[in-house]
């Protein structure tokens, strides 16, 4: 996983321009020698701590990851997580500024009173590759006679050891007797190469060219496309017809071209991108100024535009629409503090997180983001398996407009672009609460150089309402609060920002939330209002959300790969359908509520649209709770949100996108575990001609009876735009759940029984 962040994005201003009467205590001594003093504000901000001044109490509050510190100027003692700590040198004031000794950070934040971070004594076998391991893998690959100088790196990641060995390590402390290996994917021009490197023995194990596949779009492709556009006379002439004389003000967005069986006139074996463009008018929001009906097709190998596709000229919307607040007055909001005065309730040991009864491993992947692994729940002293590995499997954002600049738009954000690579650093106090621990993560860039992403993942505990409550008449109230541990990650893919939360509940439930925010992809039109002559045609495929701007209808479809091991690897898929049946037992009632229960025995039958009136369980037929019920987890692909996709993809069955990406149309898939089956859209979905993902994985229709199975959960929203989402979109959430079902013997949050005296 990552290291705690050394930088804080929260811009906390010290309120020190007040009538403080503390005099500069010079010289200041520590251990008999003169102390070297440094400015508190600058020093602690660079360290990544929040600094707050309470004018009424005349004290500072300092917050950094698991440490919560209170200290008064001139005091010889600080309070760290509720415990007193003697200071070698007090905080002193001079000219209304606070100064601390250069040993202050070490004295306070390394005092041992913050127990959030623990030293990892046994490296977890699923730890992501370190920067040194990435460098080692690249050196070994580059030493191959087959390596060419212009080869770029798509992914460099851990090739995990066998699942059985990892579980034995996690539960029984058995060492993994397998060398660390790196899985390396490269692009030699348009050709994909896969390599495996043995890091322990420092050797190349395999080198495999991949045929009939296109690789990811890499970050340097964006710069290449912009350069090609800037130097194209043909493109300059095309934008000039639209009243744009300075082509360098045109911002390009390179997009994958999809697959249409040659009907788009594009060569299948060429490495192509379609480029749509926007005009930078200086308002900080070029997305509001689309250059409509103009598409440039760029060949990345030839480094040139091979085709320009044009439709009727539509004037570029020119009204400024900044979203950064430059033209607004921010509302006055009183501060809200989240404090943990005695420290965190969780610990982070290397890449393992322990909170209440949960233990799990956390790492970062350049394609799908956070990987949650070896998830166990401590049930009265027994560690029980819940999930071997969970992550975003993949996602797609398909648009429903058939026009020239829109018909090909179906963004496979993780599979085509790499959402881990596009991680957005988390802003403390805005993107995550101020009490969050922010973790840096390291991945490889396209040159194979390790790249640290600051504040890549946030971990925090939060209040989540009552866990349970009952008020018996005449008796004391019985209730307890619900706490949740959240692992948050954000990826920015072009105009949209996606927030993913993995939420652990004390009662054994795991929630997975996906939030979409950012800027809508909009279409330039002639209509200013719905009363204009062209309004009906202009809004056939979307909503008029501003003058001359339509938000086009589309979907955000997420799929999560969940290798659940419910109290063990061998599980079965069980259906429970509540039904109304006649009352045959007598009495005044004519009907009863009953449940039809049956097993779903194979992969093709398991692929289903989600009916919220039914129950689907992954059950362990070999384990029972004390009442004799099989222990299970309920799979809930949609547990609330906006515009659910429960009825599937909004495409006709004869569409190529429908055939290439089956995962879109059904919300529940279950397949037999195979370690190489990792992505619902397939390993290389860019311009794929057929389904190489879940449609292929389930084609052999393997049995799901009492076997190691993987759950693939599809959810999302059908996004019909509205004015309230423009020019920037409030976060729209969709929620999913994995809920224990007879997994426990009783309410799991009651606590342990008191021991007899």
Swiss-Prot record:
Entries under PROSITE patterns matching the protein: COPPER_AMINE_OXID_1, COPPER_AMINE_OXID_2
Residues in the signal sequence: 1-30
Keywords: Calcium, Copper, Manganese, Metal-binding, Oxidoreductase, Periplasm, Signal, TPQ
Chain sites annotated for binding Cu cation: 554, 556, 719
Pathway(s) it belongs to: Amino-acid degradation; L-phenylalanine degradation; phenylacetate from L-phenylalanine: step 2/3
Residues reported to bind substrate: 411-422, 493-498
Region (Disordered), start-end ranges: 680-701
An annotated Gene Ontology molecular function: copper ion binding
Mechanisms controlling activity: Inhibited by 2-hydrazinopyridine.
Cofactor: Cu cation; Zn(2+); Ca(2+); L-topaquinone
EC supergroup of this enzyme: oxidoreductase
Full protein name: Primary amine oxidase
């Amino acid at each position: 996983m990552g290291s705690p962040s050394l930088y804080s994005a929260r811009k906390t201003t010290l309120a020190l321009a007040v009538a403080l009467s503390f005099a500069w205590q010079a010289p200041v001594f520590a251990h008999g020698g003169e102390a070297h003093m440094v400015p508190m504000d600058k020093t602690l901000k660079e360290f990544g701590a929040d600094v707050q001044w309470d004018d009424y109490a005349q004290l500072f509050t300092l917050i950094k990851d698991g440490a919560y510190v209170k200290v008064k100027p001139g005091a010889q003692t600080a309070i760290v997580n509720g415990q007193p700590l003697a200071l070698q040198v007090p905080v002193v004031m001079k000219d209304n500024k606070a100064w601390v000794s250069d040993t202050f950070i070490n004295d306070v934040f390394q005092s041992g009173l913050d127990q959030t971070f623990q030293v990892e004594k046994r490296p977890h076998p699923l730890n992501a590759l370190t920067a040194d391991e990435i460098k080692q893998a690249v050196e070994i690959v580059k030493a191959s006679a087959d390596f060419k100088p212009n080869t770029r790196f798509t992914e460099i990641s851990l090739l995990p050891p066998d699942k059985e060995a990892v579980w034995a390590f996690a539960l029984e402390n058995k060492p993994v007797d397998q060398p660390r290996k790196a899985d390396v994917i490269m692009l030699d021009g348009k050709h994909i190469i896969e390599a495996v490197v043995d890091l322990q023995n420092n050797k190349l194990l395999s080198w495999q060219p991949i045929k009939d596949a296109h690789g990811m779009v890499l970050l340097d492709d964006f710069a290449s496309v912009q350069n090609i556009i800037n130097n194209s006379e043909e493109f300059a002439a095309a934008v000039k017809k639209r009243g744009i004389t300075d082509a360098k003000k045109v911002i390009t967005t390179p997009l994958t071209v999809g697959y249409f069986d040659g009907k788009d006139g594009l060569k299948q074996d060429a490495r192509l991108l379609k480029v749509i463009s926007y005009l930078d008018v200086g308002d900080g929001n070029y997305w509001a100024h689309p250059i409509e009906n103009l598409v440039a097709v760029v060949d990345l190998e030839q480094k040139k535009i091979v085709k320009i596709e044009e439709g009727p000229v539509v004037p570029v919307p020119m009204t400024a629409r900044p979203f950064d607040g430059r033209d607004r007055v921010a509302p006055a909001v009183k501060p809200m503090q989240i404090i943990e005065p005695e420290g965190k309730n969780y610990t982070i040991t290397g890449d393992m997180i322990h909170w209440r009864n949960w233990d799990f491993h956390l790492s970062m992947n350049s394609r799908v983001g956070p990987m949650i692994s070896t998830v166990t729940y401590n049930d009265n002293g027994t560690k029980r398996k819940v999930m071997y590995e969970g992550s975003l499997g993949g996602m797609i954002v398909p648009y429903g407009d058939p026009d020239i600049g829109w018909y090909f738009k179906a963004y496979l954000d993780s599979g085509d672009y790499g959402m881990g690579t596009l991680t957005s650093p988390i802003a403390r106090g805005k993107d995550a609460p101020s009490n969050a621990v922010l973790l840096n993560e390291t991945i490889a860039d396209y040159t194979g150089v390790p790249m640290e992403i600051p504040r890549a993942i946030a971990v925090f505990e939060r209040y989540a309402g009552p866990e349970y409550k009952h008020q018996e008449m005449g008796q004391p109230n019985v209730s307890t609060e619900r706490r949740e541990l959240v692992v948050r990650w954000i990826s920015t893919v072009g105009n949209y920002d996606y927030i993913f939360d993995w939420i652990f509940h004390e009662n054994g439930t795991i929630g997975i939330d996906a939030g979409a925010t950012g800027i809508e992809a909009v279409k330039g039109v002639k209509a200013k209002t719905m009363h204009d002559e062209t309004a009906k045609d202009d809004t056939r495929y979307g909503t008029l959300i501003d003058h001359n701007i339509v938000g086009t209808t589309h979907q955000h479809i997420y799929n999560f790969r969940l290798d659940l091991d419910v109290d063990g690897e061998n599980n079965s898929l069980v259906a429970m359908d509540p039904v109304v049946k006649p009352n045959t037992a007598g009495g005044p009632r004519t009907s009863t509520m009953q449940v039809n229960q049956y097993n779903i025995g194979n992969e093709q039958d398991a692929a289903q649209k989600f009916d919220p009136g039914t129950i689907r369980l992954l059950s362990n037929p070999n384990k029972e709770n004390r009442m004799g019920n099989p222990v299970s987890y309920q799979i809930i692909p949609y547990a609330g949100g906006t515009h659910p996709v429960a009825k599937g993809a909004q495409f006709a069955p004869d569409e190529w996108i429908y055939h290439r990406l089956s995962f879109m149309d059904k919300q529940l898939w279950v397949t037999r575990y195979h370690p190489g089956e990792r992505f619902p859209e397939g390993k290389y979905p860019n311009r794929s001609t057929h389904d190489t993902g879940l449609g292929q994985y389930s084609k052999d229709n393997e049995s799901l009876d009492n076997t190691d199975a993987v759950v693939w959960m599809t959810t999302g929203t059908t996004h019909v735009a509205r004015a309230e989402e423009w020019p920037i979109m409030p976060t729209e959430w969709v929620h999913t759940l994995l809920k224990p079902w007879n997994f426990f013997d009783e309410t799991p949050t009651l606590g342990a029984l008191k021991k007899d005296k």
